[in-house]
């Protein structure tokens, strides 16, 4: 792992830890443009009660704000961003990344339930007409660390789950 990737992934894991500390699925990400963070996010699904507030979507909103404040065309910025994220983007997020023409995603562990970079569907690389541009992805950076954070979260009881869905932990 290059020092640059290690540095950005370390910061993404800080975002994931913040998500965990706030009762969210521990996923964190950074969007890096011209060697600076222009968007960062962590899952905010539980606190906003909005199932679309994944780390990547939060970061996309921050990039749009950054572009507006810095008089940059968002299209030009997104086409030159590298996304560093602790877990493989889900199908929804991979679709958004593709539509925005983000060229490269570096992620930690695979997302075996919802992964959009090949674990479930290859939204990133399949030839899908009228859905943006394929993007490259590199997975496996600190995968064990990402999995441990996820295990920690799923060992807890989700206080936001409906009573009928709460499972007893053994």
Swiss-Prot record:
The active site is at residue 56. Zn(2+) binds at residues 54, 90, 93. Keywords: Hydrolase, Metal-binding, tRNA processing, Zinc. Gene3D superfamilies: Cytidine Deaminase, domain 2. Belongs to the cytidine and deoxycytidylate deaminase family. ADAT2 subfamily. Probably participates in deamination of adenosine-34 to inosine in many tRNAs. PANTHER family: CYTOSINE DEAMINASE FAMILY MEMBER, TRNA-SPECIFIC ADENOSINE DEAMINASE 2. This is tRNA-specific adenosine deaminase 2. The gene is adat2.
